[in-house]
Amino acid sequence: MASPAFMRFLPRCGAAAAFGTLLGLAGCQSWLDDRYADSLPPTSGVQPIKGLAQNVSIRRNALGMPLIETGTFHDALFALGYVHASDRLSQMVSLRLLAQGRLAEMVGPGALEIDRFMRTVNLRQAAEIQYRNASPRLQRFFEVYARGVNAYLYRYRDKLPMDLAQSGYRPEYWKPEDSALVFALLNFGLAVNLQEEIASLTLAQKVGSDKLAWLTPTYPDENLPFDEAEKLKGLRLDGQVPGLAGVEGAARQVAALSMLGVAASNNWAIAPQRSRSGKSLMANDTHLPLSMPSVWNYVQIRSPKYQAAGVSIAGLPGVVAGFNGKLAWGMTMVLGDNQDLYLEQLRRQGNRLYYLADGKWQPTRERQETFFIKGQRPIREVIHETRHGPLLNSALGERKNILQPLPLKSGYGLAYRSIQQEADKTLDGFFDLSRAKTIEQAFDATREIRAMPLNIVFADEKHIGWQVTGRYPNRKEGRGLLPSPGWDGRYDWDGYADPILHPSDQDPQQGWLGTANHRTVQPGYGAQLSNSWYYPERAERIAQLAGASKSHDTQSMIRMQYDQTSLFVAKLQAMFDNPGMALPLRQAIDALPEAQRSRAREAYDRLMAFDGKLTASSSDAALYGAFLHESARQIFLDELGPEDGPAWKAFVETANLSYSAQADHLLGRDDSPFWDDTRTPQKEDKPAILARSLAAAVEFCEQRLGSERKAWQWGKLHTYEWQSDSSKMAPYLGAGERAGLGAIKGYLDRGPYPAGGDHTTLDVSAYGWGQDFDTWLIPAMRLIVDFGQSEPMIGVNSSGQSGNPASPHYADGIDAWLKGRYVSFPFQPQNLDRVYGNKRLTLTPAR
């Protein structure tokens, strides 16, 4: 996320890159490696460090993943902070600035709208509450970790990674509260329905509240939410929500930085009766936006009172998901809806802003915020809050100059209510989970986790378990799927669901447990967990594969994690073949002009014969992907366009978040008003639009991939491309800085690579349905624990261990991830040398 001022060295390096000659580019990269070689910490030798009690050993495996060996837990936490800073300093600094709403201090005015959005959300308050309510023990852990981070910062303050060095920003020392802030940011990223609610207002402005329910389905077997959309009926939304475009734009920017609205992850546990060894297995792969580096980094810690291996997040002390020698644990998002947007009626009287609450006008609370901006003078702005929370559009909106304050006047405000002000022991719960040795201890630990809505699956040698965590509001009326009228107390919250209603299970008779962001409870369940479930196909595939064998082992877990079969294909084929559709569809195809008719018949025949395997080399998968793309556009673009307009962007983005109108219309909704093409005089129906889409899919492949059918490949349309945090910030930089980034794109970024799968496959590879085929969501890490093995845990990351482009471990993890080359994390002392070797960096207590 850093903003490198690369123009300093462009005279030497950028010209060769701009001309694109291989020799010049290679020379540029070599020069950059040499220029920033001293920003890489040593991997051997001895370093005296103040703050340690005893010597610490740090060894690294072939991919640079560290093994930290210490004599005390204090030193383990200190060393983890030191290692995180050495591997991911730029990432840590960027996460902290994003959470604080201070990116503009490093990036400049282009990040100011992001900062305004984040200041309004006020994660600092959430972090303070979490940290203040953590146990004294946990606070000490955070303090020791921070001292480790700062020991590295002090030692290498003049040898910063390229992006930080060129930005001119000097990182502040790490505070214990900063780790709570990173946690609050990651938790905020689980707020999928926040983006959906913002998008729903944009869509309602385009099509009206009467049609909105058709665009916001909740699940294949549930009725459309017409009752929920009724809340918005009669409200004049068009032009009456000042700053809505600014709010949506800022939320989109935060999401693009991997920190908002990600429907993420698979996990499952196999009971002993279904395993080859007669012992449990657990697998987890967390889905996050393609990024360089990954949010995750692997670490193994060995100390007398704490052993664990797994994934960690730079900025947080501990192992988030992994294995501790006795217990394995992994997590997915519930997609819990624990926030709401409220439309507030506003009016300005004199210098005060008022909002309507149950028939009375109340003054908003005002919060002053000062923004420091690189290259500009500071600005001071007011953020308004109502009884429901901060007004997201009080600081965001159209203004003549981005640096000018925004005077919010009459119209509707967007108040954001969340659970982030609630106090609990969530931070302690995560640490206790990493130390749990049995299923019973794991259940005890997960019940402490109230701030974050997760499906946590865990296993010991003989047992498996699942627990839903979080805090879920009881709504007096409404479902919270769409924004509610804030002036009407009927839509307020009434406490939270009793934790006893949080779903859980242990050792089920079926012999497995698994979650994939799907609906895990039946409609009408006593606690309203969500209305924003993800597509069900990944969960259905887990059930299909987990229940198909009684001899599961490590290899079957790997096959499941890399499985690219989509069950949506069979559902699409069943829809085509339905008695009520088969004949009308054939008639609609026959009614097409000759050229389109032959293409539509070809597409129909091939899709009906398709086996559903979305491999990168598959020709039929390319045609299938083209059909999904064209059908979305044929059904919806006439009313939601143009393509670059806010409504279409909002529509495509919501399909990334949860079960979508695109899928819902393909599998049903024959009576939807969106089947009619408003651009033509006649009234189209579903068969007519499907026939057009079939023909258009073949034409699309011909135009993009050529007329030779054998040359069609899904991976030629659908690709992975790893972008650095610096590259992701490029749209918010000045023209000169963007040119500098472009000149060294090959140094910072990787790809494209052919991709298989899509949003419905276990090997997830999601893209903008109806927009393009660029993969944005992947399994950012994979881990497997097989208690039947002498060394149970293996794992693989999606990028390199280091976030420093000068490091040999910046991108070496990509090839391992693409090819499924997992790394072992041994717990038996005699196996450590085999994986980590004998080369070590020794940290010693400084005198």
UniProtKB/Swiss-Prot annotation:
One of its GO terms (molecular function) is hydrolase activity, acting on carbon-nitrogen (but not peptide) bonds, in linear amides. Residues 1-26 form the signal peptide. Its EC number is 3.5.1.97. Induction: By long-chain acyl-HSLs, but not short-chain ones. The keyword Hydrolase applies. InterPro entries: Ntn_hydrolases_N, Pen/GL7ACA/AHL_acylase, Penicillin_amidase_A-knob, Penicillin_amidase_dom1, Penicillin_amidase_N_B-knob, S45. GO terms for cellular component: periplasmic space. One of its GO terms (biological process) is quorum sensing. It is found in: Periplasm. SUPFAM superfamilies: N-terminal nucleophile aminohydrolases (Ntn hydrolases). Keywords: Hydrolase, Periplasm, Quorum sensing, Signal, Zymogen. Its main location: periplasm. It catalyses: an N-acyl-L-homoserine lactone + H2O = L-homoserine lactone + a carboxylate. Gene3D superfamilies: 1.10.1400.10, 2.30.120.10, Glutamine Phosphoribosylpyrophosphate, subunit 1, domain 1 (3.60.20.10), Penicillin Amidohydrolase, domain 1 (1.10.439.10). Belongs to the peptidase S45 family. Heterodimer of an alpha subunit and a beta subunit processed from the same precursor. AHL-mediated signaling mediates quorum sensing in many species of Proteobacteria, regulating hundreds of genes, including many that code for extracellular virulence factors. Catalyzes the deacylation of acyl-homoserine lactone (AHL or acyl-HSL), releasing homoserine lactone (HSL) and the corresponding fatty acid. Possesses a specificity for the degradation of long-chain acyl-HSLs (side chains of seven or more carbons in length). Appears to be the acyl-HSL acylase that underlies the ability of P.aeruginosa to degrade and utilize certain acyl-HSLs as growth nutrients, including one of its own quorum signals, 3-oxo-C12-HSL. Is thought to have a role in quorum quenching. This is Acyl-homoserine lactone acylase QuiP. The gene is quiP.
